[in-house]
Amino acid sequence: VYKRQEQTSLSLGHYEVCLNPYPIFRRHLTIIEEEHTPQTIKNRFEDMLFLAENMNEFLILYNGPECGASAPDHMHFQAAGKEEKIANPFGMTFISDMLSSEDSVHSHLENGFTTSIGISSPNRRGIIEMFEYLYDKIVSIYHDKEPLINVIAWYGLETVNRTGGDEIKQWNCIIFLRSKHRPECYYAQGKKGLLISPAIAEMCGVFPIVREEDLDKITAKKITQIYKEVSLSQEQLKALTDQTS
């Protein structure tokens, strides 16, 4: 049901890795859970890191069921080749540390295009614990339902060790916090209509255009408006950071 009959796949753990039938990246994969289970990141972030480690030429992507997931009722990830340079789409600098431990840190981005939280750690267990801690706090914003989030995770992009200057391997993750599924322009008719339903690609700066008539409507101002409309407000982000400080 969730994989085309003619699609071939490779097994990786309890997932099937397939070519995405509607690619928007040069190397674009869909990673499908073998069993029919709902789309949720809860208790799945460790799987995301497993995929990132075993597919280390790729960035692993997650869309929440109300944040652009192509099959919102069946668990899946996507992957894009690291050549896409979408791991830090806007040159974001996460400089405001929210919480740190011995081997991991997460920080939030203020006044950016999106409302985002970054996590990094050289330690796999450290980033898992940090994500799970954050997830529990984020859920409260969405009244205990599946949070409106998009997530990108990767392993193996080299970073500079602040203390020794050596290049190290590091786990990284960016969580995009959302306020809604789609902007108003998605539902609008006529000239105001713009068929954009942001998922992880759009949150990372890639906007596939479905309709030719929408090409002339895409401007930097419009994209900025869409980001602001579908992203969690700075006030809500502050409430979250206050909880985790």
Which residues does each predicted region cover?
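Non-catalytic N-terminal regions of enzymes
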Residues: 15, 27, 37-39
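Conserved His + Asp/Glu catalytic blocks
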Residues: 35-45, 51-60, 65-71, 80-245
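N-terminal short beta-loop-beta anion/metal-coordinating cradle
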Residues: 12
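Short hydrophobic beta-strand that contains or immediately precedes a catalytic carboxylate
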Residues: 31-32
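Short glycine/proline-enriched loop/turn "hinge" motifs that connect secondary-structure elements
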Residues: 9, 18-25, 107-110, 198-200
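Conserved, mostly hydrophobic/aromatic
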Residues: 76
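Short, small-residue-biased leader/transition segments that mark boundaries at the very start
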Residues: 1-2
